[in-house]
Amino acid sequence: MTEEKKFSSSNRPARKQAVPERKELPASQRRHAAKLTDGTNSSAGTTPRSNKPARQGQSQGQGQNRHTNSSRSNTQGGNASRPNQSKSQGQGGRNNQRPGSRTQASEGRPMIREKKNWSTKPREGQIDYSKKTDNSLKQYVSENEKRKQAAAAKTTKKPAEQSKKAAEKPAQTKPKTAETKTTATTTQSGTGKFGGALASGNNSARNNSRKRNTNGTGQQTPRRNDKPRGSKKSRRIAAKKGPAVPATERKEQPLPAVLEYRIGMNVQDLSKLLHRDTAEIIKKLFLLGIVTNQNQSLDADTIEILAADYGIESQLKEEEDVADIDKFFEDDTIDESKLVARPPVVTIMGHVDHGKTTLLDYLRNSNVTEGEAGGITQHIGAYQTQLNGKTITFLDTPGHAAFTEMRARGANVTDLTILVVAADDGVMPQTIEAINHAKAAETPIIVAVNKIDKPGANPDEVMNQLMAYDLVPEEYGGDTIFVKISAKFGQNVDELLEMILLQAEVLELKANPDVPARGSVIEARLDKGRGPVATVLVQQGTMRVGDPIVVGNTYGRVRTMTNERGIELAEALPATPVQITGINEVPQAGDRFIVMADEKTARAAGEERAKRAQEAIRNSGSVVTLDTLFSTMSEKAMKTVPVIVKADVQGSVEALSGSLKKIEVDGVRVDIIHTAVGAINESDVTLASASGAIIIGFNVRSTPLAKSQADSDKVDIRFYNVIYNAIDDVEAAMKGQLEPVFEEKVIGNVTVKELFKFSKVGIIAGAMVEEGKITKDSKVRIMRDNVVVYDGEVASLQRGKDSVNEVKMGYEFGFTVAKYNDIRVGDTVEAYIMEEVKVK
């Protein structure tokens, strides 16, 4: 057999075309067409007509035409003859006489363009399909099927990864292999696509073979699942990951016998208790007529209905009140077996300028006094110092009367009280107040008689004065320790520290560092960069960075923790003062704090405490009884001075507010409508504008937007850094709120010299100032024959063509009077102003 070669698109034989049925020609035309056909074939070098009879069911003419088309389609380039040449000849050869046509050879003339031998002889290894034999066509079909099978084998070649998957799932690959073999067998037997078409000679089979998704039987070919899908990158990533692991089915846990719930649980909490998905619980509640989400709190009735629908019992779990943090400070909650010694907490108290801050400055080797406005401590500071390896914690409280609450707060968290009394000044009102606070807190008192270095110092006189308040020195048989010191030069300061440590040993101060930290807020403020900052004193336990904490009516998580020198600490032991950040709002000075187990519990406790505080405020002002009705009405009849107080720290806010409320002016009281820590903002200005309040800023400034808004709304903002000045200004404003007394003051006399009438303006009076002056803002009294005819205001004041605000004596001017045109020449005008008489 001749060597077979693959057919390309250029040498592949054309598909058999459908030849329409032709009518029988007359005998004369058939003879003429036969001569033309013989001549053309001989000149073109084609194979002579076959003398074989036509197939059964076909006419002679049809067989000739099909043979002619078949032989011409195999010629390279298709230039030897046209496909429908025989048809043209059969119709009479109307195109045979065209110049340059190849059919000119039938007239005996050589072909004009006959330069090559247009032979249809097949090439080496090529099958001659010009011969109309069934074997050659079957051989073509067989070769075509072999090529298709080879191409399919290349396409279905699988990589190593796909071979592994195919080995894992043999059930999916076997039907494909069987289907391929069946198709190949059918094709070889001549009943496939081409075999069926050639055997039957039906043209519709060829059309069916062109459908991509159908096989020879007309059924749709199944999709090839083994073909790689996706981009090359995605297949490469999938190959690295390996075969997908099938997901395991989730085993549903059984329902609990009893659902123990608490008030405020949401769907997420219930899903953990019921071992069910949140979507299932939400769907079940929806079917029960309750629309909710997974974060919404549910009441007791809803939870009980859900438990009944699941067929289980429900029981309310009684839990302790997490919002009540005061119970953690009770003595019965402390385990005495785990107590260890702790440093003493000492509060320094005394009158103004008696040297408390100077003493503390010497102890901690820092300069605090120079930074305080007016040389007075403005808020509590907490510091630590060491002596002979032992630590002492000091709390510095202001001595001014405005800071009464802060001194009381300091006494409540302290172990010892250092009462500083100036030797040259003696006992003062704040000294007595400090003694009372220390006695109320039941804390021992150590008296430090300061300023013994001054010439007029008399320490013995101070000791005698304090004996009247049950502070008897040990020299006189009492139990009160007296130490004579000079804080400025450090004289006898070490002796004072030794007395403190000695007294601490007597008190046996201990704490448990293993419990959750708890303590008190010494000071709090709002920092621009760090947010709310609180100075706290740890009284029990150990505080660490990251602990969830409840502080007063707010909560948070300890983000940073620093000591008085700004050094960051990882933990704070008992009796250690630290500054913490991370709380949501600025707490009140004196609030208690406690570290919770988790942030969720801390948040619940803080929100509940804030809610209770708001309810207490609303209830305190809403109840009116017959006993309080008259007093309430009296208060509403009183004049008030609304004030908004903003300060840098909470202690200053409380001190300034308390001092303002104590100002006594008959018939007037101060109404503090808002207090806060931080800069004065737009909200404060808006509130002041709506209520007519004065804004007092203590050691704070206003934002640029607040300043511009205050200018436009004409809101009075006052800034202070010394509390005395703020109190004096507010007291003056309160005195101004009383009914003012005005007196009339004549500032000038004017005589009308001439009148000028204008239709648009009216009458303009030309006059001269005889005495004093006249201003545009002054009032005028027009007198005619010493009788007042009109009393009103100046509408306009001019000199020449220019408007002026004032005209002095000896000058001429023109003026008009508001709402009055009956002025006459010779009238005398008296200019005057109303001047307020200050209340003494």
From Swiss-Prot:
Region (Disordered): 1-251
Compositional bias of kind Basic residues: 230-239
CDD domains, per database record: IF2_eIF5B (cd01887), IF2_mtIF2_II (cd03702), mtIF2_IVc (cd03692)
Annotated stretches, region: G3: 396-399
Residue ranges, compositional bias (Polar residues): 38-50, 65-83
Comp. bias (Low complexity): 84-102, 169-207
Subcellular location: Cytoplasm
Domain of life: Bacteria
One GO CC annotation: cytosol
Protein name (Swiss-Prot/TrEMBL): Translation initiation factor IF-2
